[in-house]
Amino acid sequence: LRLLRRLARAAGFELLPLRKAREPARRLVNLLERSRVDLVVDGGANRGQYAALLRELGWRGAILSIEPIPELRAELVRRAAGDPAWRVAAPVALGAAPGRATLKVSAESDMSSLLPRSPRLERLSPSSRPVRRIEVPVVRLDALPELVASPAERIFLKLDLQGFEGSALEGARGLLPRIVGLQLELSLVTLYEGELGWRAMIDRAEALGYVPWLFLPGYVEPRSGRELQMDGVFLRADAVGTDERGGESDDR
């Protein structure tokens, strides 16, 4: 979940993240508890805003945060230091294949990406321009040492990777039997070249056996009011209780 941009940056076509309502976030925490999640994996943790919000809303379970940008990870480590159930992984990016990649670090840290910005994003958010590039190791999530060694059996995976969610999800295939839920950033318009659109991401999640459960508002373009991104929460079909399955709809 993202920090609200300073209103001074909301002029013109700059992006303004819609403040995510407390009620959907509380529903998410309730969902974690009902699904008996024993580990939340926060991929693309930035400064730890997502984990901090879960804690604020009462989630007391284990959290593993993953962030490749050194200064953000250092801040994340400091933030998690007083919480024995909150761990920070090694500084890596997540992808479908191990290797190294160039991360384009944005002036807006939560807009940093392994993918190039689209012309639309360049026009909408000049402040998201890259200010430097760094080489980062890329690992598959199912090969991440902190997860390979983890005893967790009911993992909730959140991916907020600025267009790289599809690749990271592919790299989590070996963990899918242990992943009961997903939270994926969904782009309603193309903001990063090569990213999967929202329809393709939902199709991908469903093909892996996860059903849409909850949607959280994301970025809007302030001049038009058009929503540009949202978060989709998905539950593994066989992890959903019988009474809850009965309320599902196949409407598209």
What do these predicted regions represent?
Residues L1-R252:
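Phosphate/nucleotide-binding beta-alpha loop and adjacent structural elements of enzyme active sites
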